[in-house]
Amino acid sequence: MMKKFAVVALVASFGLTACQTQDPYTGEQKTSKATYGALGGAVIGALGGALIGGGDSTDRRQRAMIGAGVGALAGGGIGYYMDKQEAELTQRLRSSGVSVTRVGNDIILNMPGNVTFATDSSDINAKFYDVLNSVAIVLKEYDKTLIDVTGHTDSTGSDQYNLELSQKRAQSVAAYLIGQSVDSRRFYIVGAGEAQPIATNDTPQGREQNRRVEIRLSPLTTS
């Protein structure tokens, strides 16, 4: 129960921060009452259907989506569907800093931490909103996929700090996409901390590569 509460609180904070405006005279950050009521409630409610941490239940998500009337993919249609989705993501994300990689029938989006977040923060950089908006458009168009969002860090800092930061970053990205009307029931959200590096942590360049959020898109099937 406490874990779920912490996630909801984080999403509420993210949603309000994302819609704050700056007073041109005082420089103070302000949030309108409409933002509190509309955005905060919508995002919190949407995230309720997502799976947060723990063991991934692909079957549960598959049943939820198929039960909601989303048709499953089968046979040769799987590869064709993912090919089309990959092509559109590649086109929309060109020059964004986000890489699009195909692994079998899955698609992996790698979002580097240095362009997605400020240092030691889970607040998404405002300049990255347009990139996430493009991702959300494709995810809504291709709704026959499950979405795994995993946060990663480098090895600087304690294991616990890195785990918590990676979780918060994954949740921030997922919350933003859900706030753009991507179905929360498709999501599995987890932080891996420093446990899954893709480069050495012995150099600044390697550590920069390891600080990232990955989105894995898997076809919705009945198996």
Where do the model's predicted regions map?
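Periplasmic OmpA-like peptidoglycan-binding domain that tethers envelope proteins to the cell wall
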Residues: T150-T222
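C-terminal motif of bacterial Sec signal peptides marking the signal peptidase cleavage site
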Residues: G15-A18
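Short, low-complexity, glycine-enriched hydrophobic/amphipathic alpha-helices that associate
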Residues: Q22-E88
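Amphipathic, membrane-active segments
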Residues: M82-N114
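Sec-dependent signal peptide recognition
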Residues: K3-A9
